[in-house]
Amino acid sequence: MQKSEILFLIYSSLLLSSSLCQIPVDKLSNVGVIINEGKLLKIAGSYESRYIVLSLVPSIDLEDGCGTTQIIQYKNLLNRLLIPLKDALDLQESLITITNDTTVTNDNPQSRFFGAVIGTIALGVATAAQITAGIALAEAREARKDIALIKDSIIKTHNSVELIQRGIGEQIIALKTLQDFVNNEIRPAIGELRCETTALKLGIKLTQHYSELATAFSSNLGTIGEKSLTLQALSSLYSANITEILSTIKKDKSDIYDIIYTEQVKGTVIDVDLEKYMVTLLVKIPILSEIPGVLIYRASSISYNIEGEEWHVAIPNYIINKASSLGGADVTNCIESRLAYICPRDPTQLIPDNQQKCILGDVSKCPVTKVINNLVPKFAFINGGVVANCIASTCTCGTNRIPVNQDRSRGVTFLTYTNCGLIGINGIELYANKRGRDTTWGNQIIKVGPAVSIRPVDISLNLASATNFLEESKIELMKAKAIISAVGGWHNTESTQIIIIIIVCILIIIICGILYYLYRVRRLLVMINSTHNSPVNTYTLESRMRNPYIGNNSN
């Protein structure tokens, strides 16, 4: 191992250790929170291009037509492999049109395909795949002149590998398949062996090569899309090493390792020549930029028991540590290597303040949810051992399967090779790593943090009912609005106002007439009452005539 590699490993270890000191891993494990070792963050924002021209048929001048039949049969095999690929490329080029803006200066014209306008003829809107294909097509057209030159050079030379440098700094590597075999074995054998033997030997080698070609390059030669380029395809078939191609780029060795480990060397077929039996691959090598002082941790949690109840800490799946600040990380579009996460952009996400305090060791701030089913994990691996909730689970130790009794004051139990050996969790048995250590953190009291709900609630039916109700209410409101609008329009006209005034006047006259009539009736009643109550002089009328019978009797 070289000195630079040793220094890099030491630097990485120190960086990881210094960052882990900020997150109390042992303390968090007591509430079931498991924090794995952090990894670096690298951004893959752009890429460099390389072109590989594969010459599938070797240059060989066979005397007396020796081996011609085998070459023809081999070409027929290649036709069945390459013709569909050629047809797909022609279809792609017919659907995608590229307009290159060219600026003319005192020097040579400069083509700007970073400003290319990509459109589609048959399809109205360009999709992401079409845009990618259009960019690859534009780059292929830019390199077509150089590729044509090296094709001619391949035909004239007997070398198995050719390399040219483009004016813009890109390299085109020409790999001539089977050429070394032809140079070293077939040509010398022509003068020593009979034609049939030489042709048979050549045919066997060509068939073997075709089989290896179809196997190793099946992902690239089976589609016009972008696929990972394997190391075996280049090293075994074409006598080249991908690390040599990568070494031409000024990259750190750790970046090269991450690129190879994550299979980020992408190859796309951009040209198929059925006359010369040559295939051109556009190889993209990402450019990585490490973000200094940033680490990403994978986090998980198991249930823990406290105060006789089972709880589960809600924590992000990934945590990012930037200097003195913590946050979540969305690594959905990232690729994980052994030492780093390679992301197309910064994956940082904001997390609540209580989660930050929880990750920094204040377990009383950890948001928790009460466990009501068995879907929450009950154990996890940590430091070569196992951390488990042995109150909610059945834990055993050793080959005798001795039950583990967890102290009620402790949230979880740590089982290692030293104190347990053979570990059993709910019937699952496993052996701990001999180098594992017991992770303990004092005897401090663990407090339950704020309770939150992380269970997904299905409210689709309620939402549907509410939506229907709102739609019906909207219809009724529109009807009411129409009625109000109709009612509100008639009283604003001038004729209606005049009619209202006349009606009011008539009503006033009628009311006045009624009042006058009532007044007269009342006055008449008053006069009648006064007449009956006044005194009357009574006179008695006596007859002046005497009764004749009375006078006679007196006499």
Curated annotation (Swiss-Prot):
Range of residues in the leader sequence: 1-21
Concerning InterPro entries, the annotation shows:
Fusion_F0_Paramyxovir (IPR000776)
Which positions does UniProt annotate with glycan attachment?
Answer: 100, 241
Which residue ranges traverse the bilayer? 497-517
Membrane topology, as annotated: Single-pass type I membrane protein; Single-pass membrane protein
Give start-end ranges for the coiled-coil region(s): 138-166, 462-487
The record's note on quaternary structure and interaction partners says: Homotrimer of disulfide-linked F1-F2.
Protein name according to UniProt:
Fusion glycoprotein F0
Species this protein is from = Human parainfluenza 1 virus (strain C39) (HPIV-1)
| Gene this protein is translated from | F
